[in-house]
Each structure stands twice: as structure tokens, then as C-alpha cells.
Regions:
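A short acidic, Gly/Pro-enriched loop at the edge of an enzyme's catalytic core
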Residues: 112-122
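Conserved Class I S-adenosyl-L-methionine
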Residues: 3, 65, 188-275
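A short glycine-rich, Lys/Arg-flanked "PGG" loop and its adjoining helix->strand segment in the class I
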Residues: 135-146
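A short SAM/SAH-binding and catalytic strip from SAM-dependent methyltransferases
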Residues: 120-134
Length: 275
């Protein structure tokens, strides 16, 4: 499988509906604990550009355990959030328990019954590529009120310093060669920019605005390995292969990095207006 951050729509036809529903179920708790949050600076900027006022209703597609949800909910928006994984859905409900105007539904976007022109914004954070584009964009547009906005937020895969990567590369070559490619900042920026183009190419959206920033995070080795376990290429590994890889990664990290590892990632959004 190609890297999670390369925009390939995950070859969704290769997976059954049930497989797509449960893909992250086994790592829902790890996802909740380890995935980076979306910077509030970007959240505020998205709210500004989408012209969301206090009465705006947001439809979130693929909310996961509520990683982006709580950021928008904290700004007092009403939200209907769709999440196909039962495990992630339950975590999202726990994380959003203090926000009475947030409803989390255990359902796919495809199965969800369309509520036409109800929403000021359709929000999806590192999730919309799981939906076939010929379904996702038209349905999102139909759910939006006139001049409503599609907000696609993305966190690209966290990358260690190149010196650390060189150490880990040797491990990947032994245990999982397909996962050993280093994504440069330029590569991540290119992949990020390409994602926004799909919305325009759908013929249902216009006036694309894209912004991004570089984020830096320090992880303990345990937390970094937990983070890796939530990325799709690692989920796809056979259990024995994954266990061997993670044991070797841990050994290399503890030997060369001490107790923590510094990583960086590109975080950003694409906002497009309904035609």
C-alpha cells in the first residue's frame, strides 16, 4: 500500500464497505492518544475564511475519535459528526461529552441520509480520501447551503529528522522496505497541494483557498511507535511482521535517540465554496 499521505484515494474499490468501516477500529485508542491535533491557528483561520457565524451548523465526515471535532466544538458550533468505526465513534462521544450541540453518529458518509442544504460547512480532517470522489464531492455539495464551504484539513505524516531517518532506514530495509521512504518537506507540500485540486475538478466547488504551516512535536519513543501504529501502511502489515518491525525500531531509537524523538509535519487546510 502506498503511503497514507499520498493522495491515491486508498484504492477504495479494493476494500469492502466493512473493511473501510473497521480499518482504524483496532487502533482507535492509539489514534486518540497519539495523533497530532490540528493547530488552533488553522482552525480559527478556517472559521474566518468559511465565514462561520455562531449559528452555523457543521457536518463532519469521518470524525475519528474527535481529533478535530473538539477544536470546532469549543467555538460553540452545532455539529453532526459521522464516523464509521464504532470504537472511534465511542471515543468521539466521550471526548465531546461536554459539548451538547455535538452529535456523533456511527455511520459512513455514503450510508448517511442526505439532509439537503442544511449545513454551512462540511468538514473532513485527513479522512475524505476514504470516500470515492464521485460520491463524496457531489454529496458534500448537496448537503451545503448556498455559498457553503467544504473544509478539508490535513495533517501529513510526522517525519523524524533526516539523521534519525537514516538510522531507521536500515531497520525498514530488513523488515518493511516499502515503508522506508523519507518524505521531504517539498514532497509533503506537493502532495498537500494536489489534494485541494480534487475538489475543484469535481465541478461542484470553486474559489479554492489553501494554507499550511509546519508543526514540530516531541514524542517519547513509546508514543512515537504508538503514532506509527495508527498510519495505514503499518495497519496493513501482517501482525508478525509489524511486531518484528516495531521491536527493531524501538531498539534503534533507544540506542540512538535516548528517551524522545523530535518530529515535524505539515498541517493545513483546503477550503472551497459550493458552486
Amino acid at each position: 500500500m502506498e503511503s497514507e499521505q499520498r493522495i491515491t484515494w486508498f484504492k477504495v474499490d479494493a476494500y469492502t464497505v466493512q473493511q473501510r468501516k473497521s480499518w482504524y477500529s483496532q487502533v482507535a485508542d492509539a489514534y486518540n492518544r497519539a495523533r497530532p491535533r490540528y493547530p488552533m491557528k488553522l482552525v480559527y483561520r478556517a472559521v474566518e475564511l468559511a465565514e462561520l457565524d455562531k449559528n452555523a451548523i457543521i457536518l463532519e465526515v469521518g470524525c475519528g475519535p474527535g481529533t478535530p471535532t473538539t477544536s470546532f466544538a469549543s467555538l460553540a458550533f452545532s455539529m453532526i459528526c459521522l464516523e464509521p468505526s464504532l470504537e472511534a465513534c465511542e471515543l468521539a462521544r466521550q471526548n465531546c461529552a461536554k459539548y451538547p450541540d455535538v452529535e456523533v453518529k456511527n455511520i459512513t458518509f455514503e450510508e448517511w441520509e442526505l439532509e439537503p442544504t442544511k449545513f454551512k460547512a462540511v468538514l473532513s480532517a485527513t479522512a475524505f480520501h476514504w470516500i470515492p470522489p464521485e460520491i463524496g464531492y457531489p454529496k458534500a455539495a448537496d448537503a451545503l447551503e448556498d455559498n457553503g464551504s467544504l473544509i478539508l484539513m490535513l495533517n501529513m505524516q510526522a517525519q523524524p529528522d533526516y539523521e534519525v531517518y537514516q538510522v531507521l532506514h536500515q531497520v525498514y530495509q530488513i523488515h518493511a522496505p516499502s515503508l522506508g521512504q523519507y518524505e521531504t518537506r517539498e514532497t509533503q507540500e506537493k502532495n498537500f497541494r494536489s489534494f485541494g485540486k480534487f475538489a475543484i475538478d469535481s465541478g461542484r466547488f470553486q474559489d479554492l483557498i489553501s494554507e499550511e504551516l509546519v508543526c514540530e512535536v516531541s514524542y517519547t519513543i513509546n508514543d512515537y511507535l504508538t503514532l506509527l501504529s495508527t498510519y495505514s501502511p503499518y495497519i496493513a502489515l501482517e501482525q508478525q511482521n509489524r511486531d518484528s518491525l516495531f521491536a527493531a525500531l524501538r531498539e534503534a531509537l533507544e540506542k540512538n535517540c535516548g528517551e524522545s524523538i523530535e518530529v515535524s509535519y505539515l498541517s493545513g487546510f483546503h477550503i472551497a465554496r459550493k458552486i
